[in-house]
Amino acid sequence: MAPWSIDELHGPDGEDWRVPVGELESRITELSNNLAEAGIEAALIQSPVDLYYYAGGRQNGALLIPAVDSAASTEQGGDGATFFVRRSVERAKFEAGAGDSCLEIQKFPSLRIFAETLTNMGIDGGISLQLGEIPADFGQKFKSALAPLGEGKDCTAIVHHQRETKSDWELEMMREGAKVQRQMFEAVKQSVTLGATELDLVAAAEEVSRRHGFGGTVQMRRFPLQCDRAVIASGRAGGVPSFFDSAIGGTGPHPMAGMGSGFTKLEENQPILVDLVHVHRGYVVDATRMFSIGGLSERWLERLSDMVEVSDSVVASLGRGDDCSKAWQIGSELAESMGYGEHLMGMQPDQSKFLGHSVGLQLDESPVVARGFDRPLVDNGVMAIEPKLVFNDGSIGVEDTWVKTKQGMKRVTLDDSYDLIIDC
């Protein structure tokens, strides 16, 4: 049998699902300039998420990006950004654009001579590592190997800040993801029947998502890096807390997966909260809608209407350029004035203290609509706004993913044509 070929690396119906080379080039150039402004010689990118962001794939390796004023940069006559790959070099070349790539790609040298290799490239100073992303022992190993070059700073915040602003291409990926996500909600709708379990509904949503290219993992920034991307909680299960820092815990199927959907069966006149994430070519969209069998009581409907009002207040605040902490204050104080202080985003003592989280390649990006985030959402920043209420007999709320524009906030996920509550 013939060896594998790059012709086998494609999206559906032969589509090229690689990140455009122009995207990679502009991202690397921006980071190179940011490093120079911060007085950093070069950054070594090793987080899989950021390797995809800058190199177009997450092969096992380390991507060196010199500052624009470093002798190793292309601007100063050096080789520029170089991806040192352990495996697979051939896939790394293809994913970075093959013959059009803006990267140098080579086999990772022995770690014993890595510092010398970088010196020969023109590096003259400490290398900045992603110490806020990589495991401590892994980071220490590289700090020791690169010590001859000098002390290096942590570049985690620089990379995170750059990724807050999404390009037009990234926003298009999210819009495409939202189309698939809508089909996921429709699949859930078709599966809502008396006696079905939460996991039955998850399976219906998963089938749609997988069929459209979901890779199986929702990337998280915060330890323990775990998330269930389809959280469906019915009735009293919606009031069960979990380890996960979000409004809705859920029973999960067993203690090792102790969050999200479980074996709770659907009943009449109970709130069924459906929180679905889809990831399209790496990019997250997040939305929540309510379902029921036979309708909900006026009290539940009033609660949902109130959360829509809270969501609108947060969206308006972010849209006019308020700090995210101000948006939190406005939304949480409104909810408290409605009498929901002990039920907003969970019940005491397990309440979460946020009303929205940025999304992109990861579900939990920054900034967050919470106390302490004293800065606005940037233009082309993307945020999932999700005020929810939790009671002993269930949970209810709304969530959509929004993008900040110069004209204000625009919804990326389900539009007004999709009901906030679907009675099946």
Indicate where each model-derived feature is located.
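Active-site neighborhoods and metal-handling regions in enzymes and metal-associated proteins
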Residues: 1-424
